UniProtKB/Swiss-Prot annotation:
Belongs to the SmpB family. This is SsrA-binding protein. GO terms for biological process: trans-translation. The gene is smpB. Keywords: Cytoplasm, RNA-binding. PANTHER family: SSRA-BINDING PROTEIN, TMRNA-BINDING COMPONENT OF TRANS-TRANSLATION TAGGING COMPLEX. Gene3D superfamilies: 2.40.280.10. Required for rescue of stalled ribosomes mediated by trans-translation. Binds to transfer-messenger RNA (tmRNA), required for stable association of tmRNA with ribosomes. tmRNA and SmpB together mimic tRNA shape, replacing the anticodon stem-loop with SmpB. tmRNA is encoded by the ssrA gene; the 2 termini fold to resemble tRNA(Ala) and it encodes a 'tag peptide', a short internal open reading frame. During trans-translation Ala-aminoacylated tmRNA acts like a tRNA, entering the A-site of stalled ribosomes, displacing the stalled mRNA.
């Protein structure tokens, strides 16, 4: 059975720029105005990444637009947001991203079936230029294949 996910934002560039080796789910600490803005779908995680600060993991560069109906207590749009993970998961992540070349990238943000905001993270390794070219060639070849099959 597939799990219910109402996707708020996706990072499609991450799949092109990185090799995703492992995926994991994390909760995120938000303010009330941020949740209301997310319900309207006003978020972007294109350039966002996560990093550790000792025993905690934070999401950086995630843009959540200000909620128009909030008064003066609105939130900062690009503030660092704490990710909610178990201690074992944090230690595992820190061990993996301390290796040279690995980073923690936000892949998607969504509401789960209990209406909690979750972030899907990926432990990723950056692609070189030649790898990106190969993935473009593969994508074009698959598109051409599907055209040929449809024509027959």
């Amino acid at each position: 059975m597939t799990e219910y996910k109402k996707v708020i934002a996706q990072n499609k560039k991450a799949l092109f720029n990185y090799f995703i080796e492992e995926r994991l789910e994390a909760g995120i600490v938000l303010k009330g105005s941020e949740v209301q803005s997310l319900r309207q779908g006003k978020a972007s995680i294109e350039e966002s990444h996560a990093a550790d600060t000792g025993h905690e993991v934070f999401l950086y560069n995630c843009h959540i637009a200000e909620y128009e109906k909030a008064n003066r207590f609105n939130h900062a749009t690009r503030r660092p947001r704490k990710l909610l993970l178990h201690t074992k998961e944090i230690k595992k992540i820190i061990g993996r991203i301390r290796i040279k070349g690995y980073t923690l990238v936000a892949l998607s943000m969504y509401f789960n079936k209990k209406n909690k905001v979750k972030v899907e993270l990926g432990i990723a390794k950056g692609k070189k230029l030649r790898d990106k070219r190969e993935s473009i060639k593969e994508k074009n070849w698959k598109r051409d294949q599907s055209r040929l099959i449809r024509q027959k």
